[in-house]
């Protein structure tokens, strides 16, 4: 068992003076990065059972308090269930599971189309992508790709999807109007993630096995450059102005910054221990890096390529999610079964909320009044009520676990789609 950092979540976190560089000890892939720790203590189990029981009682009458809603308006959360070969559909207005959709084998990553009422599901073991109609909540099409797809990235105009095929070292390009693969582009060794830039001009691909990042020209549908970066590159974030891509490398605890105008690596930053996921502020100013083995998250100044600070948080932080007003960061702590809340402008952790077992994926409802948390081991989605008030420029947050919604076996990713019937 790893030595864990003991801390009190009620106290202000210690700011770490620097992030030590520690050699990576595990041969992890993208999908395996959050499955390192198994088993929980009796105390954790009892605590969770009590929390779940109370939440279930509240959940009997749980429903979001909203003004009168146009009956054509719908809001659904979609959860991929890896071991159930299905996607659960949660009505986020009623806060209940309304349907289970059978998809391919071992569904992992999900993506929302911003321009049409569709969700895309990467089925890792059946080597295909399911297209779900959100109006009918059923599979509208299944498109074969190549071996071991984990993630789907959709262009901002909703016309293309890009899928990195980890087992065949290439990227499939799907025309979403034709619902067909229009190109298969060779990239580096074991590509884990392909992400399209906000301006739709380039797709960045992290090649875990080759320690490189490939850059695909979306007009020519060809690789324009492949750059050596750091060890076992994994997660990617691209700045809102499409000027830079950052890549997290858990193999040597570094972040690489790539200038997309010159296609050059402009910085290698030492970060915390086992950086596996990044969360970007909507304004692009800061990146928050979850350091799984360090029990910390690091703050990176995106435009100056500097690590400004690191904070102790819960055990084994995984996903991060920033509110649209850039004020709060939510972090799921895989090892301590809770979600931490960090006030960005104040630079402090302001609280935590207990959830189910092994929390991972996060999603905020469109008006951000509820946070949904995927609990991978307990097979449910925790719903946290979120409110914010400002008093003398200080942010306080009142959070409460509203309910726990059962889903499938080993859920992992979650996305939310809001739309009106017959329209966008």
Annotated model-derived regions:
Residues 7, 23-24:
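Intrinsic-disorder-associated, low-complexity terminal segments enriched in Asp/Asn/His/Tyr and depleted
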Residues 1-7:
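N-terminal acidic, proline/glycine-rich, low-complexity intrinsically disordered segments
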Residues 2, 15-22, 31-36, 41:
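Short, low-complexity intrinsically disordered segments enriched in A/P/G/S/L with frequent Arg
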Residues 27-29, 39, 59:
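Residue-identity detector for glycine
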Residues 48-59:
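Bacterial N-terminal signal peptides
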Residues 11:
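A cross-kingdom feature strongest in bacterial/archaeal respiratory oxidoreductases
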Residues 58-424:
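Predominantly soluble domains enriched in secretory-pathway, periplasmic, or organellar proteins
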């Amino acid at each position: 068992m790893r030595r864990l950092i003991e801390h009190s979540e009620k106290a202000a976190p210690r700011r770490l003076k620097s992030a030590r560089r520690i050699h990576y000890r595990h041969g992890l892939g993208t999908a395996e990065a959050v499955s390192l720790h198994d088993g929980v203590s009796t105390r954790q189990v009892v605590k969770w059972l009590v929390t779940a029981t109370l939440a279930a009682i509240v959940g009997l009458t749980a429903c979001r308090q909203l003004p009168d809603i146009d009956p054509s308006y719908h809001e659904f959360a979609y959860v991929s269930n890896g071991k159930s070969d299905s996607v659960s559909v949660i009505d986020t207005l009623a806060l209940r599971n309304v349907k289970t959709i059978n998809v391919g084998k071992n569904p992992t990553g999900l993506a929302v189309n911003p321009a049409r009422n569709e969700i895309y599901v990467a089925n890792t073991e059946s080597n295909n992508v399911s297209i779900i109609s959100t109006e009918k909540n059923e599979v509208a099409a299944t498109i074969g790709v190549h071996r071991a797809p984990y993630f789907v990235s959709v262009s901002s105009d909703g016309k293309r999807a890009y899928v990195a095929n980890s087992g065949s070292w290439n990227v499939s390009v799907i025309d979403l109007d034709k619902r067909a693969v229009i190109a298969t582009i060779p990239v580096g060794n074991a590509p884990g993630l392909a992400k399209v830039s906000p301006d739709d001009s380039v797709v960045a691909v992290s090649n875990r096995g080759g320690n490189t990042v490939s850059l695909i020209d979306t007009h020519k549908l060809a690789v324009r450059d492949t750059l050596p970066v750091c060890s076992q590159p994994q997660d990617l974030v691209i700045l809102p102005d499409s000027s830079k891509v950052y890549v997290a490398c858990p193999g040597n605890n570094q972040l690489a910054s790539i200038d997309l105008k010159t296609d050059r690596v402009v910085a290698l930053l030492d970060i915390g221990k086992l950086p596996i996921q990044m969360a970007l502020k909507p304004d692009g100013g800061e990146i928050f890096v979850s350091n799984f083995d360090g029990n910390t998250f690091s703050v990176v100044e995106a435009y100056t390529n500097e690590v400004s600070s690191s904070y102790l948080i819960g055990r084994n932080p995984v996903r991060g999610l920033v509110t649209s007003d850039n004020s709060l960061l939510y972090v799921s702590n895989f090892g301590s079964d809770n979600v931490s809340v960090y006030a960005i402008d104040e630079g402090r952790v302001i609280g935590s909320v207990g959830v189910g077992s092994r929390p991972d994926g996060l999603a905020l409802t469109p008006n951000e009044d509820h946070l949904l948390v995927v609990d991978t081991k307990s097979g449910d989605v925790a719903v946290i009520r979120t409110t914010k008030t400002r008093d003398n420029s200080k942010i306080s947050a009142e959070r409460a676990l509203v309910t726990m919604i059962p889903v499938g076996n080993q859920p992992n990713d979650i996305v939310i789609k809001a739309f009106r019937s017959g329209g966008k």
